[in-house]
A protein has these predicted regions:
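Aromatic-rich beta-strand edge motifs centered on tyrosine
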Residues: 1-21, 32-42, 53-63, 75-85, ...
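Tandem-repeat architecture and repeat-register "anchor" residues
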Residues: 25-26, 46-47, 67, 90
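A generic structural motif
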Residues: 29, 50, 71, 93-94
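Sterically constrained small-residue positions within well-ordered secondary structures
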Residues: 5-7, 26-28, 69
Length: 105
C-alpha cells in the first residue's frame, strides 16, 4: 500500500510504494514529480510539473543501457554498452529564435 511522509523541513510531501521507492513528490510551491521503477528497482521514468521527462532502460546487470531526456529547451537520446561506453547519441537543442540544432554521434 505504500506510505506518505513530509521531508525533514516539512516543505515536501513524499509518497512511496510498497518497495520504499519514491513514486511522487509535491512541494508547497506546487512543483510535483512522478517516478516509475522496473522490476529490479531501477528508476526508469521521471516526469515533473515543469514538463521535464526522463526515461531510462537498464541491462540485467543493472548498468544503464539507454536514456532519453526531454524538456522545453533540449532533448537527447543515448545508448550505452555493458561497460558504460556511449554507442550512439543524439542531442537536439531548441533555441527560441534560431532553428533547431541537432548533434548526432
Amino acid at each position: 500500500m505504500g506510505y506518505k511522509e513530509y521531508d525533514e523541513y516539512g516543505t515536501r510531501l513524499l509518497e512511496y510504494d510498497d518497495n520504499n521507492n519514491l513514486i511522487h513528490s509535491k512541494e508547497k510551491c506546487g512543483f510535483e514529480a512522478w517516478y516509475e521503477y522496473d522490476d529490479r528497482g531501477n528508476q526508469i521514468y521521471i516526469k515533473d510539473s515543469d514538463g521535464v521527462e526522463h526515461w531510462r532502460e537498464f541491462y540485467n546487470s543493472g548498468k544503464l543501457k539507454s536514456e532519453h531526456y526531454k524538456d522545453s529547451k533540449e532533448e537527447y537520446w543515448y545508448e550505452y554498452d555493458e561497460n558504460g561506453k556511449t554507442l550512439k547519441g543524439k542531442f537536439m537543442y531548441f533555441p527560441k529564435k534560431l532553428h533547431q540544432a541537432i548533434i548526432t554521434y
